[in-house]
Regions:
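Short, surface-exposed secondary-structure boundary micro-motifs
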Residues: 15, 21, 193-194, 236
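Conserved metal-binding segment of the jelly-roll/cupin
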Residues: 45, 51-52, 125, 183-195
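Active-site pocket scaffolds in enzymes
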Residues: 187-228, 234, 241-243
């Protein structure tokens, strides 16, 4: 089971701007004009959170299954109007996530201007969630300066740094979500896909690789995930354990 098998809320940001730019290019969409000033946030399902070894049941391969390697935090009680300068006391735990996404369902959903729903199935989380102080110097100003490694079908496809290029810190994300609401202890807040501009760092989701292939060769050549595929997500320092999942058929 996930550290929290159910949560009051699961809220995911998109704080790595390189990811936003690449994925929007992949669906021929422009980044918002407020990209650097106003965080992107969506609210996912929190009643069914997957554990680090739970298989992912793929009901329709044509939906375009993709993994997304992320860092997330668990909040304590967070008052409405909490500012970034006050948010450190709200962040209680840090862990990893695999924010599964069904890419082929995204364009039609977003075209309706009402956000993600069917394209965001249950999210998986690392075995362990640790207090920020356990990260030592790796926890700086609301960012986890850890290296997130994604291993797809036994091959390392990404070793991305989660700290320096996280444009909006977790504290800034807290300020954004608390603008009009308060949050109960146990709310989970995600960073979005960890992504670096340096292509040598690799990828934390297949959508980025497909976009890079399109930029370089005119079309994507990497398919989305299929039954039998595996994904392993872990961080250095390894405080959270590894998420290791296999895609299975319905």
């Amino acid at each position: 089971a996930a550290p929290l098998p159910r949560a009051f809320e699961w809220i995911d940001g998109s704080a790595f701007l390189n990811h936003v730019i690449l994925v929007r290019k992949a669906r021929n969409a422009e980044p918002p004009k407020t990209l650097e000033t106003d965080p992107l946030i969506y609210q996912g399902g929190s009643g069914d959170l997957l554990g680090c070894r739970d298989p992912f049941v793929l009901r329709e391969p044509a939906w375009g299954l993709d993994f997304e390697s992320e860092v997330c935090v668990v909040l304590g009680d967070t008052p409405i109007g909490t500012k970034a300068s006050e948010a450190a006391s709200c962040v209680k735990l840090v862990m990893l996530a695999n924010d599964w996404t069904l890419r082929a369902l995204v364009p039609d959903e977003l075209a309706k201007s009402f956000g993600f729903f069917n394209s965001k199935p249950a999210t998986a989380f690392s075995a362990f969630a640790v207090t920020p102080d356990e990260l030592g110097a790796a926890w700086q100003n609301g960012r986890a300066h850890v290296r997130v490694t994604s291993t797809y079908n036994g091959n390392v496809v990404g070793t991305c740094d989660a700290g320096p290029e996280m444009h909006f810190s977790f504290y800034e994300l807290v300020q954004h979500i608390a603008k009009t609401r308060r949050f109960a202890a146990g709310t989970i807040l995600g960073s979005g896909t960890v992504s670096n501009a340096d292509r040598a760092r690799g990828i934390s989701c297949l959508a980025e690789r497909r976009m890079i292939e399109t930029i370089e060769g005119g079309k994507p050549t990497t398919p989305f995930m299929k039954v039998g595929d595996t994904i392993r997500i872990e961080a250095t320092p390894n405080l959270f354990g590894a998420i290791e999942e296999q895609v299975v058929g319905a």
